[in-house]
Each structure stands twice: as C-alpha cells, then as structure tokens.
UniProtKB/Swiss-Prot annotation:
GO terms for biological process: cell division; regulation of sporulation. This is Probable cell division protein WhiA. Involved in cell division and chromosome segregation. It holds the Pfam family LAGLIDADG_WhiA. Residues 275-308 bind DNA. It comes from the Bacteria. SUPFAM superfamilies: Homing endonucleases. Transmembrane segments: none annotated. The gene is whiA. HAMAP family: HTH_type_WhiA. Keywords: Cell cycle, Cell division, DNA-binding. Belongs to the WhiA family. One of its GO terms (molecular function) is DNA binding.
C-alpha cells in the first residue's frame, strides 16, 4: 500500500465526532466524489471511490447522521492491477437533505464553492478538508519530492479549498493539470501541519521520521562535498606550490632564497601532501598556518616574476 493510501486509510477510520463536523466531512466527500440524479421528483446521490474504508465512512455518515436510506455496491475490475470501485448510493428524501450537504440552495439551484454555513467553526473547516483529501487528495512518499494535493473538476471549489487551507497559513496554491484543478502544498512543514490537524497522526510520524533522515543525509552529503572541495583546493594549492618551488630551483636555485623561504620550500618538496599547518609544525621554531601561507605567497610571487622574465628573454631572442 502506498504512503498516500495508508494516510487515507488512517483518516477514514477516525471515529465520528460532533454533528457539525460530521456534516462538513460528508459534504466534502459528496461534493468531491458524488453525482446528483434527479428523476420524477426524487433524488439520488452516487458517491464513487476506490477506497473501501472511504466508502464505509460515506455509508456510515449518511445513514447515522442524516438517517437516509443507503446502498453500497462493489464494482469489480477485470483488468489486472486495477482496484475495485465502490458506489455508495444515498437517497435524500427532501430538498432539505441536499441543502444540509451544501449542494443546493433554497431555490433548488446548485451552490458553487463551499457554503459558509458548513465551515463556520474551526472544527468544521478541519473536517471539510479531511473529507476533501479523502475524496480527491494524494500525498507523495516523503522519500521523494514533498507534495500534497487535492484535485477537483470545479474551479470555484478549487479556489474555495485553497482559501480554506490558507486560513491555516499552509501556502496552498492552485494549478491546472489537463482538465483538473489541482490545489497543492509543497513545503514539508505545511504538509506536516495539515496531516496533524486532519488527524493523520501515524502518517505524520512516518513523514517526520523520513524527513529527519533525509535532512541528516543531505547535511552529511553537504559536509562531505565541502570537505572534498576543501581537500581539492588544498591539493591544487600544494601542486602549484611544488611547481613554483621547482621553477625557482631551476632558475636561480633555492640557495638564493632568504632562509625562511628556503626552509619552507625544502619542506614542501619533501612533504608535498602535508597541509600548511603540518609544514609549520615541522619548522624550528614552529610557525603558524598564516605564517607558512605568507612565505608560500612570497615564493609564488617570485616564481611568477621569474616566469615573466623568461618569457621576455625568449621573446627578445
């Protein structure tokens, strides 16, 4: 089972709470996954999902909360690796039942977006978002890219969901993917907050554990890369120093150098892999890293001058 499916399974098993919260959650599930049929002055709501726990939740809420007749049917897929789908058929008795779910207004017209009456309180907003995620949401495995989304084919509902999420400062945005409107969250901290308040505590812990391990691995990689870069710089500097010392030795000889420069030059030729600090500790008396670096710069400058003189002589000849 994927991380997303495990998260939904956990959310679908949360026990029902207050009536207002249950109504908000059912309204989101029906709005996202349901279709309304009207024939001969009678109504039917068909809610289709591939999740058995979600189907059971819709069934339970519609039956216990609104006391409506409900049927549940399984549609078995014949193709390999395809999940079964479940259709929960709800039979509202009156227009008022549909109004309670925020689907129709008093005139029987379809209501756009999310009716304010369903999400007045914080607990209702959380319940509605939980229902919306159960119906149309998904979350990436935290081992990969951080991404949580809820998809809908209704642009007004997408904007309303985004605003609802951003009441909790979750940085939600909306984009288009083919004919779908995608409400998404990218920041890992915001995803953690969302999982926490909708009640996916087990998923949250797993997400956090993976995130901590990823951060540790990234930090170690950064340190290794930094150490490697520093080592490469040290090696490059040592190679350059040896080349410059050899240029001086071949041109004027090391004996022509002042004693402090000659000593460090001879040590560098003898210990080409040593660090500046290690070279300084070999001197008598010992010299600090900055002192050794100063002497090496003097040798580099002298080598450059000798190279320039050599070029002029060759050019003149």
């Amino acid at each position: 089972m994927s991380f997303s499916a495990e998260t939904k399974d956990e959310l679908a098993r949360i026990e029902e709470g207050k009536r207002c919260c249950n109504l908000a959650e059912l309204a989101a599930l029906v709005r996202m996954d349901g279709t309304l049929q009207i024939a001969n002055h009678s109504y039917a709501l068909n809610v289709i999902t591939e999740s058995a726990p979600v189907a059971r939740k819709v069934y339970r809420l519609a039956k216990n909360l609104l006391g409506l007749p409900v049927d549940i049917m399984v549609r078995r897929k014949l193709r390999l690796k395809k999940n079964n789908s479940y259709m929960v058929k709800i039979y509202p008795r009156t227009l008022e039942d549909l109004q309670q779910l925020g689907l129709l207004d008093e005139e029987g017209e379809i209501l756009p977006g999310i009716p304010n009456v369903l999400v007045k309180k914080k607990c209702d907003r959380i319940a509605y978002l939980r229902g919306a995620f159960l119906a149309g949401g998904s979350i990436n495995n935290p081992e990969g890219t951080y991404h949580l989304e809820i998809i809908t084919n209704d642009p007004l509902h997408a904007e309303a969901l985004s605003k609802l999420l951003n009441k909790f400062h979750l940085g939600a945005k909306v984009s288009m993917r083919k004919n779908w409107h995608v409400v998404y969250i990218k920041e890992s901290e915001h995803i953690v907050e969302f999982l926490g308040f909708i009640g996916a505590h087990r998923a949250l812990l797993e997400f956090e554990n993976v995130r901590v391990l990823k951060d540790m691995r990234n930090q170690v990689n950064r340190l290794v890369n930094c150490e490697t870069a520093n080592l490469n710089k040290t090696v490059d500097a040592a190679v350059r120093q040896v080349e410059n010392i050899q240029r001086v030795a071949n041109t004027i000889g090391l004996q022509a150098l002042p004693e402090p420069l000659r000593e460090i030059a001879e040590l560098r030729l003898e210990y080409p892999d040593a660090s500046l600090k290690e070279l300084g500790e070999m001197l008598v008396p010992k010299v600090g890293k900055s002192g050794v670096n100063h002497r090496m710069r003097k040798i580099d400058e002298l080598a450059e001058k000798l190279e320039e003189q050599s070029k002029r002589v060759r050019k003149g000849g």
